Amino acid sequence: MFLLLVALVFAAPMLVAGLLSWSGWQPGVKGNGHPILPQRNFVAEQLQVRLGDGTSWPWRDSEPRFTLIALAGPDCAAQCFETLTGIAKARVMLNRNQSRLRLLYLGTPPADPGRRAAMQTYWKLGRDIDGKLAAYVPATPDSVSAVLVESNGTALSLYPAGFEVPGLLRDMVKVIR
């Protein structure tokens, strides 16, 4: 009887861990973005983005690099620009890994010429030709949502309008190594 109790003490945690794992729970895994379900691959979907110079955005780059897509709501102005600047700063804070992240802005850029010029320092400006990303574009004026895309074109996380840039940075540090 005593041996059975000892075996149960060791088996019970394994059974609980197995049940939690089977139910999909993962310890300590908490991202700031929302998972994109069902999973989307922009290469497989042939999602076309036309850049300002007329070229197409290459989802699969010559080097494995992530893409952060910023999707602007209507009338990108002060708040929108502040968020975009925060994202560009977060990219710089990746230090030696900042070259592993490309920044792509889709939508109408800010009307202010100074802000537009400042933006083009860090961001590639383009547009979603077929509107396949329309579901992720915020409806709120002067806002931005973001989508983090893996180097193979798989969309990982959605950061809806109003997201916190430090949370985005924490997630990027976890996945961009």
Model-derived segments and spans:
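Short, surface-exposed patches at the edges or C-terminal ends of soluble domains, predominantly
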Residues: T55, A88-A90, G131, R170-R177
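Membrane-entry signal-anchor segments at the cytosolic-membrane interface
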Residues: M1-L8
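Thiol-/selenol-based redox modules, centered on thioredoxin-like
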Residues: D142, L148-R177
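Short active-site neighborhood of thiol/selenol oxidoreductases, capturing the structured segment around
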Residues: R60-I87
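Extracytoplasmic
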Residues: E63-F66, Q98-R100, P141
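Conserved helix-turn-beta segment immediately C-terminal to the redox Cys motif
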Residues: W22, L84-L104
